[in-house]
């Protein structure tokens, strides 16, 4: 069989095209891998900070043997859970039991798609960014309910029911607060919301324009994270460990990861929606604006904006960790009353007030 020169060139061009597609695929996945690496490091830092802050509040030393200042303690705990035996309940629903933790983790990780960590540093700048986050985060309680139901354990099932009830109770006030912010910014895009706060610097933050909404969003975020005083789905004194009771090994580690990922996502959204995101508090002044724009200056500006965003997020993290180790747990009826009888009317009134001001200003 004789192949002429034209056919050989066609075959070579086709192979080159396939190679370019593979290279493009690798380049496209690099930002996702970078984000996953950053998320992993952030979770390890949050775990270390919580242990140090809780030790300081309780006048203890905290972790000190695993690495300098106990920095490697979280890695040691994760490695231990990785090699633990994965025990399955004999009378449980094994497929649902295995899928539950994965659904919770994936739903939280997808929320990072629309979070602008810095200037021009967001995976997906969508026109419905904040609503996509609310929709995705609503899937996580389904995984927790599946975990509780499939364990065939009364404590686990009650914990799953509590998680679902708590999520529904506080998702609605949180959504109303996000709607009020969207009205002020005339957009549902997270990037547009941050840029709308940059005009007047520190005084342009939505924290000052929406103080009531900020407080409601703060409380609702803590409840969504199931942190003390809102950790009723896994109350040790009542439910052993709630929906996590029958889990061990890596699956238990996934639930541990979900709680800190949820806390990180909530902190970043507090920063994006109310604290100006990556913007500094000085209006109209950018240090890098004095230099001619090039690649190096662009990288420095992006790095600086990521640093500013994370610094603001750590403020909320510090508040939530301090609250966890200082306030007692609420009862279930108190938690539901707070969500339905107080936060829901307040958030609805705040939304109506914001809508009225926007209509008057037209």
From Swiss-Prot:
Xref: InterPro entries: NADH_UbQ_OxRdtase_su1/FPO, NADH_UbQ_OxRdtase_su1_CS
Mode of membrane association: Multi-pass membrane protein
Keywords, comma-separated and alphabetical: Chloroplast, Membrane, NAD, NADP, Plastid, Plastoquinone, Quinone, Thylakoid, Translocase, Transmembrane, Transmembrane helix
Domain of life (superkingdom): Eukaryota
Primary location group: plastid
UniProt subcellular location: Plastid, Chloroplast thylakoid membrane
EC number: 7.1.1.-
Extent of the signal sequence: none
One CC-aspect GO term: chloroplast thylakoid membrane
One GO BP annotation of this record: photosynthesis, light reaction
NCBIfam families linked to this entry: PRK06076.1-2
Alphabetical list of PANTHER family matching this protein: NADH DEHYDROGENASE SUBUNIT 1 (PTHR11432), NADH-UBIQUINONE OXIDOREDUCTASE CHAIN 1 (PTHR11432:SF3)
Complex and partners: NDH is composed of at least 16 different subunits, 5 of which are encoded in the nucleus.
Family: Belongs to the complex I subunit 1 family.
UniProt-recorded name of the protein: NAD(P)H-quinone oxidoreductase subunit 1, chloroplastic
Gene: ndhA
